[in-house]
Amino acid sequence: VNLNIKTQKAFGSWPSPISAELITRAAPGLNCLQSHDDSLFWVESRPWEGGRNVIMCRQADGTIKDLLPKPYSHSSRVHEYGGMAYALSDESLYFVNASDQRIYKTDLSGEGEPLAITGLSLQRFADLIIDRNNQRLIAVCEEHGGKNSGEQEPENYLVAISLNNENLSV
């Protein structure tokens, strides 16, 4: 290769492996990594699905699967920016759904429809953790509108939700 040969071309006419399409192509975002048993879990943000956030699982055998069927999307709006909005028990995934801020439960197999374990309310949930000793889900709860109609600021407190009967206590 002769490095002394110089070639001149007009601005913008050099061929490049980097195209505008390559730069602007939607790429998934990955965050909220957790390990559980022999599997890895993470949240995948999908721009090509309108920004839907899907909880993913990579099993010990290398199988990767979505755990949230459409239209469910993982996201919390507690403190306006959210927090860890999913937790794993031995058989179940608990997650906050973006559209209604309710906590849902679904099977770790990814089969079946998620079931809401909290009602429609002014409450938002984040930072979910499983308390295995007491069989409950602990979460930060943010209530908008407050218990008194004149309150402007959200009220924040911890809640415990029984994994056996889904009763919520403050």
Predicted regions and their residues:
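Multi-bladed beta-propeller domains
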Residues: 2-29, 59-82, 106-124, 152, ...
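Hydrophobic alpha-helical membrane-insertion signals
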Residues: 17-18, 22-59
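Conserved beta-propeller blade repeats
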Residues: 25-39, 73-93, 122-137, 146
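Short loop/turn segments that connect beta-strands within the blades of beta-propeller domains
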Residues: 36, 51, 60, 89-90, ...
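A flexible loop/linker signature enriched in serine peptidases of the S9 family
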Residues: 44-54, 74-80, 95-103, 118-125, ...
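Short, solvent-exposed loop/turn segments that connect beta-strands within catalytic domains
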Residues: 49-50, 135, 166-167
